[in-house]
């Protein structure tokens, strides 16, 4: 290792030590760092890089924890954290781009889409090479009943996740739970009357299938855990912000997306993502 390289590493080590709260006082300086590295290098040439890597990992973990705290506390807008992510999903997910929360370059959603649309997006997704992939499918899948059972649909969903993993082995994949359907016919206003709706085209069979959404979410949560995939449970925000559903009982208003986006980002942060960049960089 050249002396120039040792000086740079010593400066990095010193910075890491100070960031880590390990200040050595006035006696810690670059010259001492170089001497320390030279002595350490004679014992183990790889030890220097190992120390710096460990310090970097510790620093990233502190940054991740602080970012998580800020997002949860509402001090950090979650949407800038989507800059290295891509969202795929149905018309509900389209709202992230439509309402201006996520840039069009990060959006691969489409109205009426299901997991059957994922294969045709793989080449584009691979070319985009995102660090994070958020999947928000399920409403249309459950409604059409194509798979015959929830378990069969979940199995194919996870097959499509595996397809993405094969194209993007380093990407973090996050599955959003399916937002519930609120039957407009079951709602009443302050007078006890059913308010007028925007004219949903759902059949009674559609409504019965959509009533399975909570069960689908439960089954997918278990399956995702078994397959090492992050699953985001949106049930709490869906209950808290039920008033943000549109009259059709399917779509959500613009005001709901910050809560949904926050949920997605928090899930990735809690699993060690977002701030956890490569320590070897």
Placement of each model-derived feature along the sequence:
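N-terminal secretory targeting modules
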Residues: 1-83, 271-281
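Extracellular glycan-modifying ectodomains
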Residues: 23-33, 78, 95, 128, ...
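Conserved SGNH/GDSL esterase-like catalytic core that processes O-acyl groups on lipids
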Residues: 73-156
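Loop/turn elements at helix/coil->beta-strand transitions in domains of secreted/extracellular proteins
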Residues: 82-84, 128-133, 168-173, 227-230
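Extracytoplasmic/secreted proteins, especially bacterial periplasmic and envelope-associated proteins
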Residues: 83, 87, 120, 132, ...
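Short, well-ordered beta-to-alpha junction loops that form the rim of enzyme active sites
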Residues: 90, 177-180, 234-236
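Active-site segments of SGNH/GDSL-like serine hydrolases
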Residues: 136, 140, 165-210
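Catalytic His-Asp segment of secreted/periplasmic serine-dependent ester chemistry enzymes
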Residues: 186-281
